[in-house]
């Protein structure tokens, strides 16, 4: 803000992702997953709102297809992303007409680099994705770019970028 004196866009992309079987959920997991996936986007948007309104800007939240179709073993992550999906729609109402608020819901794009996601589960997901492959971070970036720059009459929407995964679930 100091350098350009305006804010045109906010992309809430920070996220934590790890399994939380019901019996293993604790306060630390709650704080991490809810904090990064729901709390941070809310308060960042709140802080940015006056500047975004002045610039007639846009917000894009990165949700997940599992916000609406939960992934077994990840109830806290799914709940946090479902909250972000609801927040996206609520903020579209709150910030209109000056600010557009949308979301992108990635499907199988990136996989954890540790052993927290079973390779056979990953293969099963890809098999049940219409395009039979993972997407790339560039697929998400292009969709975010579209929402920020080429969609002036779109707000309160979620675009699934999932290779057809949700059409096949």
Report residues per predicted region:
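Short, small/polar-rich loop/turn modules that mediate ligand/substrate recognition or access, typified
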Residues: 96-100, 155-156
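Active-site helix of classical SDR
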Residues: 45, 80, 88
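Active-site loop-to-helix junction immediately N-terminal to the catalytic Tyr of the SDR YXXXK motif
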Residues: 25, 70-78, 90
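Alpha-helical segment proximal to the catalytic Tyr-Lys
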Residues: 50, 93-97
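A conserved structural motif in NAD(P)-dependent oxidoreductases
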Residues: 129-140
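Substrate-binding pocket helix/loop in short-chain dehydrogenase/reductase
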Residues: 21-22, 29-34, 114, 121, ...
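Short C-terminal tail/terminal secondary-structure segment
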Residues: 69, 128, 145, 149-169
């Amino acid at each position: 803000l100091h350098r350009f004196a305006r804010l045109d866009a906010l992309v809430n992309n920070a996220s934590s992702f790890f399994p939380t079987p019901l019996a293993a959920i604790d306060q630390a997991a709650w704080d991490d997953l809810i904090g990064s996936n729901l709390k941070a986007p809310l308060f960042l948007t709140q802080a940015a709102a006056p500047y975004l309104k002045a610039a007639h800007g846009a917000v894009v939240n990165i949700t997940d297809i599992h916000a609406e179709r939960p992934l077994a073993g990840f109830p806290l992550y799914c709940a946090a992303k479902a909250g972000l999906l609801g927040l996206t729609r609520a903020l579209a109402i709150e910030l209109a007409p000056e600010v557009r608020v949308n979301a992108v819901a990635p499907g199988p794009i990136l996989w954890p680099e540790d052993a927290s996601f079973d390779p056979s589960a990953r293969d099963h997901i890809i098999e049940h994705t219409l395009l039979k492959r993972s997407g790339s971070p560039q697929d998400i970036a292009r969709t975010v770019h579209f929402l920020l720059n080429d969609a002036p009459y779109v707000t309160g929407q979620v675009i699934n970028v999932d290779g057809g995964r949700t059409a096949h679930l």
